[in-house]
Amino acid sequence: MKEWRRNILGRELVVQYGKVAKQSSGSALVRFGDTVVLATANISDKAVEGIDFVPLTVEFQERFYAAGKIPGGFIKREGKPSESAILSARLIDRPIRPLFPKKLRNEVQVIVTVLSVDPNVPPDVVGIFAASLALNVSKIPFEGIVAGIRVGYRDGQFIALPSEEDIEKGLMDITVAGTKDAVTMVEGEAKEVAEEDMVKALRFAHSVIKELVDFQEEILSEFNVEKIPVVEPTPPEGLVEAFKDLLNKEELERRILVKVKKEREVALKEYEEQLLNQIAEKLSVTDLEGIKPFVSELYEDAVKKTMRRLIVEKGIRADGRKPTEIRPISCEVGLFPRTHGSALFTRGETQSLGIVTLGAPMDVQIIDTLLEEGVKRFMLHYNFPPFCTGEVKPLRGPSRREIGHGHLAERALKNMLPPEEEFPYTIRVVSEILESNGSSSMATVCSGSLALMDAGVPIKKHVAGIAMGLILEEDAEIILTDIIGMEDHYGDMDFKVAGTRDGITAFQMDCKVSGVSDELLMKALMQAREARMYILDRMYETISAPRPHLSKYAPIIKVTKVDPEKVADVIGPGGRVIKKIIKDFDVKVEIDDETGLVKVVGSSEENVDKAIELIREIAKEIEVGEVLEGKVTRIEPYGLFIEVRPGKIGLLHQSKVGEDMRQFLKKVKVGDTIKVQVINIDDLGRLQFKRVTEGENTQHGKTHSKRN
């Protein structure tokens, strides 16, 4: 067993190797502060046939024992990965994926298991460090060292590993990963920060990343691991030369420049089939399937190089646009009669339908994860059905990609929402991607913002998003605005920026190259800002402010406040009072017994108002001398019990009836209404009444109460 220690950011970072998981090809047990994770890396013996990508899987296992908790719910065992675990797995996957050899076809599995969790040291950040180490000490081909860090920005200072208070009161929450040379991955949110501050944050993060990578280099200097060779199939003799001879570059250009996505795909596929047949004929090959993978690979490379060359040399993109040009945009709102808010945002061949549903406070999402407990009142769900790209696939639950895209769009919008005190609704936004050709997550931000305004949610400002790309050649650096799927696939960088007219609210970046300079990143962010302003103008032209009224189909929520000491009166013995209010007025009621905040939800405004009025009446302090009307609930020989408010019952003693009790009882029965005056409230809060007769002059405030 080997162990290494280093103090980083005022915490001890401890790495152990050879103590646990020794049968794994690579493993690392890493402790940073009180967060402990185990990362393991393994590879299959045989390559997977018929694929053209690296078959990498990253799993992030949350174990509730790491936080000293037992899983909630009926089954007390962790099941399928939670949404937070999936997001953490994606966060680890993205910086390591580009570092595998492109021709690797053996299955690789990285598993990060959280064994102990420190709220101030995110396990996914430690997971990036541990996964990098596990891969580097294994026999798996892996070409680099990566690390990650979480960064906050508060009171003009950048903070590595910010506390929850720093995040809440600060302006930024981003996770950054990279190599010793550059930042390669960013994911996070901000409260309308400037582009300059975002670049400074990445520079600050990279200074910490370099220290973490340096520690890994120190550890890895003690290892001399023999990596598995990546076996590349050899193409048949003469195939590469035949492909070069038969490829017509002008014809390939013409097909790449077909403007419509589906037509372009068909044109390129047809030309690939044509080349395959020509090569087979030239080489006298009868087994087309045998040479098809080699031809496809050569063709893919030719398409990539040609698309990039057209952009660099001629400034022309596949759909005919210039590098900074945005596709045509259209926005519509109020599409459906019964939904609470709706919007259709179309940018070129990417289309998102945003639907807003307003729910009651009790419709919140309950959160119970390793690091979080509580509720979530704003949710954004992103759906990417197969028809949006004209494909046929089985419909199952949300994919990791759908969860990740929805999370990014949610972070972009959430800081523009009104506080719960001003708008007590639970808000759900659903984005249905109806058509996709790049940047659907940013289209979701736009459709979500439009739909929120259409629903009458008082968001502070519109939020728009744009996806940017980069073509990096030895003699050129071309930044692309509003990339399509083809440019995302063949480009060197994909970064998404969402924000208002005043700053960035969400940012995501993935780099396929070794990294980009601060100057280039700043240039790209400013180009993205111009695009964002253009899109925001189109959105404000469609709907410039939240609608003044909610949909008539949205639930009505009204809020009142009562003295916390009176909450018990509103609830009543065994919940009798509140249950009666709920039943009588067909409403839902939520009461915070600490603050006395009462929320009443219903479909009828009249009923909600009546319920609120009654709750206020119940919570109102009853004073000695007050004249009230109440119903007789019980008759005893010594007097009558009268309910003057729900749950508030007092005694009208026979001596206070004002006439002979026997005669009076002949005239009264249970359920009758009697006017009484409060003459005493004892130390236990019990009420005593006297009967008020017709024409009697009662002087409010006279008392014999011990309280007064």
UniProtKB/Swiss-Prot annotation:
Enzyme class (EC, first level): transferase
Cofactor: Mg(2+)
UniProt keyword Metal-binding, yes or no: yes
One CC-aspect GO term: cytosol
Catalysed reaction equations from the record: RNA(n+1) + phosphate = RNA(n) + a ribonucleoside 5'-diphosphate
Matches recorded under SUPFAM superfamilies: Eukaryotic type KH-domain (KH-domain type I) (SSF54791), Nucleic acid-binding proteins (SSF50249), Ribonuclease PH domain 2-like (SSF55666), Ribosomal protein S5 domain 2-like (SSF54211)
NCBIfam families: polynuc_phos (TIGR03591), PRK11824.1 (NF008805)
Protein name (record): Polyribonucleotide nucleotidyltransferase
Organism: Thermotoga petrophila (strain ATCC BAA-488 / DSM 13995 / JCM 10881 / RKU-1)
